[in-house]
Amino acid sequence: MTVHIHPAVDNGVKKGTGSFAGGTLVCKCSDRPVKVGIKGDVAHNHACGCTKCWKPDGATFSVVAVVPRGNVTVLENGDKLQIVDTSATIQRHACKVCGTHMFGRIENTGHPFYGLDFIHPELFYEQGSAAPEFAAFVSSIIESGVDPAQMPEIRSRLKELGLEPYDCLSPALMDAIAGHIAKTSRKAA
C-alpha cells in the first residue's frame, strides 16, 4: 500500500533555495482568485495532521508554515475571504468560493504564537520556499478517519521523507511555548 502524505512531499521533500524572498499565495479559483502577498521565506514548515488545517484533495496531512504577521498582505479579491471558525484560536481566512485557507491569524496577544500567521506554502505561485522539516499532530489523522492500524506505516513513511513525526509540535516549538508561558507566569507572580 502506498502511503499518501501530501502532494507536495509524496515524491520527496524539495529543498528550498535558501534565498526565497517571498511571493504570492493563490487560491484554487479560476475566476478572480484570492491572492495574498508574503514577504520573506517561511519558518517552521511542517506536515500537520490536525483536523482544522486545510488540505488539498487526497492529502492526509496539510503542509503549513509561519511568517511574521506584518509580512502578509491581501493583494486581490479579499472580498472573497471569510473566517472559517471565529471561535478557533487560529482565525483561518479562507476563500468563500473554493474553500482554500489563505492564511491563519492569532488575535490573542497573550498567545505564544501571536504575531505569526500560518500559511500553506504549496499555494505560492513561485517556487523555492523553505522545505517542510517535521510532522506535527500525527495521531490526529485518526480523528479524520485514518485507521489506527495504518499509523506505523504512516510514521515510517514520514521518517523516510525526513519528516520526524511528533504528536504535538517539534521540540523547538514546544520549548518556545513553554518559555513564553514561564515568562508570562513570572510577570504575573
From Swiss-Prot:
Signal sequence extent: none
Cofactor-binding details, from the entry: Binds 2 Zn(2+) ions per subunit.
Residue positions binding Zn(2+) 2: 48, 50, 53
SUPFAM superfamilies, per database record: Mss4-like (SSF51316)
Keyword Protein transport among UniProt keywords: no
Pfam families, sorted: GFA
Catalytic activity: S-(hydroxymethyl)glutathione = glutathione + formaldehyde
Superkingdom of origin organism: Bacteria
Disulfide bonds: none
Listed cofactors: Zn(2+)
One record GO biological process: formaldehyde catabolic process
Domain CENP-V/GFA: residue ranges: 20-167
Binding site residues for Zn(2+) 1: 27, 29, 95, 98
Associated pathway: One-carbon metabolism; formaldehyde degradation; formate from formaldehyde (glutathione route): step 1/3
Family: Belongs to the Gfa family.
HAMAP family: Formald_GSH (MF_00723)
The protein's name: Glutathione-dependent formaldehyde-activating enzyme
Organism this protein belongs to: Rhodopseudomonas palustris (strain BisA53)
Gene transcribed to yield this protein: gfa
